[in-house]
Amino acid sequence: MPLERLNFLGLRNLAALDMRPGPGINLITGANGSGKTSLLEGMHVLGMARSFRTQKLKHAIAHDADAVTLHGRVAGDPPVALGVRRARDASELEIRLDGERGVRVARLAEALPLQLINPDAFRLLEGSPAARREFLDWGVFHVKHEFFEAWRRVRRALKHRNALLRHDRIDARSMRVWEQELAHWSELLDALRSEYMAQFAKAFEDTLHELLPLSGLSLRYYRGWDKQRGLLEVLEGGRDTDRQMGFTQQGPQRADLRLRIGKRAAVEELSRGQQKLVVSALKLAQGRLLDELTGRTCVYLIDDLPAELDVTHRRIFCHWLERLRCQVFITSVEREALANAWQSETDVAMFHVEHGRLLTE
């Protein structure tokens, strides 16, 4: 469901903002430093309760403000009201959903599925496994209802086992309890991830073919421990080495997506431009699969697309966005860079940011 209204106050260099975006393509232009990326950042915080620019949201509060306050309304029957506030002197976020306080971040994410494509996202292939796990789990979360509970239980059990590993003397009974808990929920989490990947692989292959036909590229899911052994057996056998390290070395927290060309990692074979196209295909395929499996669309936040893709691939990428029929926010320094990227029948809402002020064109 698209965002139909946004109200931001106290966000970086942006003036108080009241935006009514279009349900489809929204092009936001402006000079570097004008506030375009801050606008995307505000939407990201609304859906994820965190910024993609800073680990501490208080750093996004305008210098002359005591808090950053973000409100959004997601279209629907009925519409859904989202709210996130972070005061400079507060230790935690205040999150609201339809006026209800104390809402979990998972409920925000469920109400507003977001896909971010920015320079950091384009480094997905060469970055840490944690980024690829987050990418994978975004997809599983939105199509598998059991995922969040399994993920939460795994994190809890893992925390307890790691704490026990760091004790001078291990309580064998407690260790056994938490290893059984960790193994049970990890096996479920692995099954959900595996099921999703079986569906995602085809969507990715089809999308990539139009962006960058590559022979021999394979996408594989690695679950984080020996596929021939149950996790409980692995945990029991690895206690001594885990204790030496002070943490659990195998399990779903070590899962990864591996892209290869032949026997080599794809990142070692592909040019920087090719890597960007592969990541573009990954992101587009997730939105496509979400629509196919649930009938819901995600909102794409795309920062400075003209700087990341050449003209030809930019046009193909934009045509994919049109086919997905989702809401898109794209920033660009120059309007002309994306003027011819769309089909004539596509409605494009135009906005301009100038010295922190949003103007409708």
Curated annotation (Swiss-Prot):
Q: Which residues bind ATP?
A: G30, A31, N32, G33, S34, G35, K36, T37
Question: Got any disulfides in this one, which pairs?
Answer: none
Q: Quote the subcellular location field of this record.
A: Cytoplasm
Answer whether the UniProt record assigns the keyword Nucleotide-binding to this protein: yes
Q: Which UniProt keywords apply?
A: ATP-binding, Cytoplasm, DNA damage, DNA repair, DNA replication, DNA-binding, Nucleotide-binding, SOS response
Q: Which GO terms describe its molecular function?
A: ATP binding; single-stranded DNA binding
* Superkingdom, taxonomy of origin: Bacteria
Q: Mostly located where?
A: cytoplasm
* Pfam families assigned: SMC_N (PF02463)
| Alphabetized SUPFAM superfamilies for the sequence | P-loop containing nucleoside triphosphate hydrolases
Task: Explain the purpose of this protein.
Answer: The RecF protein is involved in DNA metabolism; it is required for DNA replication and normal SOS inducibility. RecF binds preferentially to single-stranded, linear DNA. It also seems to bind ATP.
Q: Which family does it belong to?
A: Belongs to the RecF family.
The name this protein goes by in its record: DNA replication and repair protein RecF
**What are the top taxonomic ranks of the organism?**
Bacteria, Pseudomonadati, Pseudomonadota, Gammaproteobacteria, Oceanospirillales
